[in-house]
Every structure is written in structure tokens, then in C-alpha cells.
Amino acid sequence: MAAGPVEDNCISLVEMKFIDNTLYFVAENDENLESDYFGRLEPKLSIIRNLNDQVLFINQGNQPVFEDMPDSDCTDNAPQTVFIIYMYKDSLTRGLAVTISVKCEKTSTLSCKNKIISFKEMSPPENINDEGNDIIFFQRSVPGHDDKIQFESSLYKGYFLACEKENDLFKLILKEKDENGDKSVMFTVQNQN
């Protein structure tokens, strides 16, 4: 039995035009086209650790820090150690788009506004109509490391969540990735559900 061509598997282009040295294609019928946006999917509850096996948690000042913590303490302190990672459908292919939230008394969502990491008191929205946003990160696996993950900012290309020692604290920061095997941008994500 021979395979036949699949019908209606393309967009008919009826017109092309140059505007300011950019070629634009005009679709005959654009009712099925989507604009660039992120659409929220189901969440995962996760514990995030740095490469020193320290657990990410929210301290009393609502700041994300890493600390040595046995699994039993993670369970006892679940509101501060279990993060809600919402996955988003992305209209572009750039990695798994996610937000990272925590629910202590209220829901707070991780933001990298002005390249500063903080938690905003807000629930992640259902849809985000931007191509880049301060609360969206691209979760990707690290080549050569089966169980390691990195999170790139959708707003600041080339900037990643990282662990950095500051005084006696290990803090979560946003930094430009060093191409020489920077391990500070690698994490393990242990799903709880």
C-alpha cells in the first residue's frame, strides 16, 4: 500500500513584502496562527539542590538561599523547600518554559527583574503574552550530565540561575554563564509528585 500526500499540512502563502529590509509573509487565512505567548500547564512539586547537594529554600526574609539539609528537614520545612514548578506551553521552541513558585503563607514567584533574583508575591498567571518575561525561565538538561538541569532567563538571554557564596550564605543569583564548564548554574530537581 503506497502512502499518499497529507492534505492541509501547510500554510498557503499568497503574498510576500519587504518592509525595512525584512521579508514578511502574509498568510491567506491566519485564524489558526498563534501569537508568541506562554500558556500555563500543570505544576510539579520539586526540591531543587545545587551541586553541593544543598537544598534551595526561602528564608525568613523571603530570599532564596541554599543550605545543608537532610531529607527529613526538607519534609518538615516543606512550605519553604518544596517549589511549585509550572510548565508553560511556549509558541517558540527554546526549552521547557517554567516559573518557580513557593507557597508559604502566600504564593510567591521567582523573578529576575533587573537581573536581581527575588520572590514576587503573586501566583503565576495562566498566560503570559511576552516573548521574554522576568518570571519565565527555560529549564534545560545539561549536556553530558543526565540528572543536571539549568534555568536560563527568558528575559536575559545567556543569563542563568546560579548558586553563589556570599559571606556565609549560598544564594540564588542570576549570572551570565561562563562557557568554561560553569557548574554554579547546574542543579538537580527532585520531583515530589
Swiss-Prot record:
Transmembrane segments: none annotated. The record marks 36-37, 71-72 as: Cleavage. Residues 1-36 form a propeptide. It is found in: Cytoplasm, Cytosol; Secreted. Its main location: cytoplasm. GO terms for biological process: cellular response to lipopolysaccharide; cytokine-mediated signaling pathway; defense response to Gram-positive bacterium; establishment of skin barrier; immune response; inflammatory response; interleukin-18-mediated signaling pathway; positive regulation of inflammatory response. The pro-IL-18 precursor is processed by CASP1, CASP4 or CASP5 to yield its mature, active form. The pro-IL-18 precursor features autoinhibitory interactions between the propeptide and the post-cleavage-site region, preventing recognition by the IL18R1 receptor. Processing by CASP1, CASP4 or CASP5 induces conformational changes to generate critical receptor-binding sites. The mature form is then secreted and released in the extracellular milieu by passing through the gasdermin-D (GSDMD) pore. In contrast, cleavage by CASP3 inactivates IL18. Keywords: Cytokine, Cytoplasm, Inflammatory response, Secreted. The keyword Repressor does not apply. One of its GO terms (cellular component) is extracellular space. GO terms for molecular function: cytokine activity; interleukin-18 receptor binding. Belongs to the IL-1 family. Pro-inflammatory cytokine primarily involved in epithelial barrier repair, polarized T-helper 1 (Th1) cell and natural killer (NK) cell immune responses. Upon binding to IL18R1 and IL18RAP, forms a signaling ternary complex which activates NF-kappa-B, triggering synthesis of inflammatory mediators. Synergizes with IL12/interleukin-12 to induce IFNG synthesis from T-helper 1 (Th1) cells and natural killer (NK) cells. Forms a ternary complex with ligand-binding receptor subunit IL18R1 and signaling receptor subunit IL18RAP at the plasma membrane. Mature IL18 first binds to IL18R1 forming a low affinity binary complex, which then interacts with IL18RAP to form a high affinity ternary complex that signals inside the cell. Interacts with cargo receptor TMED10; the interaction mediates the translocation from the cytoplasm into the ERGIC (endoplasmic reticulum-Golgi intermediate compartment) and thereby secretion. This is Interleukin-18.
